[in-house]
A protein has these predicted regions:
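Conserved N-terminal phosphate-binding loop of PLP-dependent enzymes in the Aspartate aminotransferase
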Residues: 1-433
Length: 433
């Protein structure tokens, strides 16, 4: 294999680290962090205080170094740090399972490690469930613009793009339905929704393993938002055609969309739910797939072939479960933090709306986004996002635009003053473009 020797390697990059989603020859080196607290990140060189405007890839739900969650992990670590979950049960997993089952109305939980595996598990469960019932189904339906993770099954479900095109020949086919993205003052939303439902209904005439979607907001695809009414229509059509609905709540769960789970805004109950990111408050990696009891029962058999042969070394890790229980405590103690966040975004975003190249402003819960129509490329490879990111960091705000999509997704603990400053920085930068 030939190796690429960089002509002018950037010596500021660590010589042993391979950073995610990054081409180092045209990206700025990682900033060294000394510590974080609440909505702030502190860097070493340059010495700087940054507002974490995207919750460190959407995970730090309650901010950095939350004392309550840190204490819960510390006390659990002194009791039990890890145990094989195939043979042993521990209190933190029991408590977490009972709480999440009660909150989602789905009875069974399967633990894994992250968002991609939580989606992968949901897909495997759905596929094998039909097999266990004597049905061979191969069709899977997802939506245009979707991103469900980076393991092979999750990649196959996502939109074919720069993230996964190198592996296209290794991925199974998936049927696609248009995603009726909407925004403030969108006059064509119902037309787009009706078109999508018609296409979905036609596809579902063929026996289908499952339909998977990111309820209300497609994250990495560009913070593409839809109305709760559309999610409700999808659920109805899926149910009427005897298929399964998988809700990928890896991003949208735990208050991010203005309700504890995004599917609740649509007043539906999916057949399977994948959760991660905010699950542990951002402290530890953990994924969970929730399933209805009827699905679980399809695996109960004397036949070994009907067993769900899947597992992870750190399944239901006690430290992760303790962090997740502590995070749920905080959400239950002060739900107004996520219930009222949308109003804060709307009060600040009015000023940005006036700029001529700002388009498609949209807000759902704690997430606010808009498009910058500058340059020919309107997708992830539009360099305007990199320019805005670099300028924002200089001014004290960390954001990571998705190409020409600028968004804010801060921790729930961000102060009104910090949120106002975040919007002010973005407005100042955009005004000078």
């Amino acid at each position: 294999m030939k190796s690429l020797v960089l002509k002018n390697p950037n010596q500021d990059w660590h010589p042993n680290i391979w950073p995610p989603f990054t081409q180092i020859i045209n990206s700025k080196p990682q900033l060294e962090v000394t510590h974080g607290k609440n909505a702030l990140i502190y860097t070493k060189n340059p010495k700087q205080e940054l507002i974490d405007g995207i919750s460190s890839w959407w995970v730090t739900l309650h901010g950095h170094s939350n004392d309550y969650i840190a204490d819960a992990i510390y006390h659990q670590a002194k009791t039990l740090e890890q145990v094989i979950f195939a043979d042993f049960l521990h209190p933190q997993a029991q408590i977490l399972s009972e709480r999440l089952s009660g909150l989602t109305k789905l009875e069974r939980l399967f633990f894994s490690d992250n968002g991609s595996t939580a989606v992968e598990v949901a897909l495997k469960i759905a596929y094998q469930s039909w097999q266990n019932q004597g049905e061979t189904r191969n069709q899977i339906i997802a939506f245009d613009g979707a991103y469900h993770g980076d393991t092979f099954g999750a990649m196959a479900l996502g939109e074919r793009n720069i993230f996964n095109e190198n592996f296209d020949n290794l991925m199974f086919p998936v049927k696609r339905v248009p995603w009726p993205s909407t925004w403030i003052n969108d006059e064509e939303v119902e037309i787009k929704e009706n078109n999508a439902i018609q296409i979905l209904t036609k596809l579902l005439k063929k026996p289908t393993v499952a339909v998977i979607l990111e309820p209300l907001v497609q994250g990495a695809g560009g913070m593409n938002m839809v109305r709760p009414e559309f999610i409700r229509q999808v659920s109805k059509v899926v149910k009427n055609n005897n298929s399964l609905l998988i809700a990928d709540e890896v991003l949208t769960g735990f208050g991010r969309c203005g309700s504890l789970f995004a599917f609740q805004k649509a007043n539906i109950i999916p057949d399977l739910i994948s959760i991660s990111k905010g699950l542990t408050g951002g402290f530890l990696p953990m994924g969970i797939t929730l399933a209805k009891e009827t699905i679980f029962q399809s695996f109960i058999s004397d036949s070994p072939k009907k067993t769900f042969w899947h597992g992870h070394s750190f399944t239901a890790n006690p430290l992760g479960c303790a962090a997740a229980n502590a995070s749920l405590d905080l959400l239950e103690k002060d739900p107004i933090k996520y219930l009222s966040f949308e109003e804060k975004h709307l009060s600040h975003i009015k000023k940005i709306k006036k700029l001529p190249f700002v388009k498609n402003i949209r807000v759902t819960g704690t997430i606010a986004a808009f498009d910058i129509e500058i340059g020919k490329n309107k997708g992830y490879l539009n360099n305007v996002g990199k320019r805005i990111k670099a300028l924002s960091i200089k001014k004290g705000l960390f954001i990571r635009p998705l190409g020409n999509v600028i968004y804010l997704l801060p921790p729930l603990c961000i102060t009104d003053k910090q949120l106002e400053k975040s919007y002010r920085i973005i407005f100042e930068i955009l005004s000078d473009l």
